Amino acid sequence: MKQHLWPLFLEAVKRDVVPALGCTEPISVALAAAIAIDELGIKNQASNVKLDVKIDVAVSANLMKNGMGVGIPGTGMVGLPIAAAIGAIAGDRHAGLEVLKSIKDSDVQAAKLMLANELVTVGVADVANILYAKVTVYYQQQTASVTIADSHTKVIAIEKNGEQCLLESQAKTTNDNSCKANPFTEAKLQDIYDFAMQAPLDDIRFIMQAKTLNDALSIEGLSGNYGLKIGATLVKNQAKGLLSGGLLTEVLARTAGASDARMDGAMMPAMSNSGSGNQGIAATMPVVACAEFLKSSETQTIRALMLSHLTAIYIKSYQNKLSALCGATTASMGAAAGITYLLDGELEQISAAICSMIGDVSGIICDGAKASCAMKVSSSAGSAVKSALMAIDGIRVTGTEGIVADDVDQTICNLATLANGAMTQTDVQILEIMLHK
């Protein structure tokens, strides 16, 4: 047992499972804009000088893809231009992924006026970074630019009036912790399982915050008018008798409801995973719904949620930060692990469930963040339940089928090889289609 990894596992979860208000790609643009205008010293008067401010945004292709069609919290609009404008006018540079938590209606109106006067431009930067956003703010004779790269809150450069205020070599001094030691270069799923099952309960109880935040988002999504209303549609048709109740329907509806609200800009934070609110929802809500359906104890729920989130982080650690592979699918593999545990499965069954999921949903593409992501989230949640139930019955996708190997860790590596290799060209094709349709 590799107990020396346990403190690193805790660090990884506390780093990667954090509250986030709004889709994290446009939020990184809003954060950069908030920092840039703050550097110019006009933050408190930004809404009054809005027509004297111009903003230029340059982002990586992947960030453009994920920012084009997703709702920005509190604005009723989608896309990177409104994210940059509202971030500059009312963003809190110290709030990280919750940069927009304090915006008011008057701020939104000011941001919309900036867009109407064509004061915000957005383009694709020719950079190697998969996650990259540079925001430059112009005010009178002053300029300030802020660059975020590689992680959603990692500021690597700040420049004011042509002078560097922060260089990439100093980036470790920001509030981003992405440079921490990576325990997953040594870890296997066995180690993740051992930690989730045996770590002192008080050390991992904090993971219940994921349940609190994402369940509240689910309730909001099921009761409000958000996105494609996938969760609400499932609940409505269950009441009509067109769908039966039970574990699967409960998991699908509650998970989709949270994603509906998230992707349509609800002013409520999600507990994220690996820099994504949807991935946090996918790793949380299927486990929560299953635990409540099975009447699992609080201890079981805590361990299931920790197993789910840490497994999701482990699988994602092999992949690029952003890719053409839908992140909700990999996060839901964590949920499959958590559900299998709640159904009294052990490591063998958990491994089987993950392998079956990779055999099922590994081809789902990411074509940007948007309302329909809730469909992919619910589909992946359904696969998690299906794979868990199969595993409990001793059934799994075998090592003779497709990219699935007999060994779960090798199968996870195979999935990453696909995502980081051939699917990079898929990503290029997806963005080309999106920009020219």
Curated annotation (Swiss-Prot):
All disulfide bonds of the chain are none
**GO-annotated biological processes:** L-cysteine catabolic process to pyruvate
Q: Name one GO molecular function term.
A: L-cysteine desulfhydrase activity
Q: Name one Pfam family in it.
A: SDH_alpha
**Family in the record:** Belongs to the UPF0597 family.
Q: What is this protein called?
A: UPF0597 protein Shal_0864
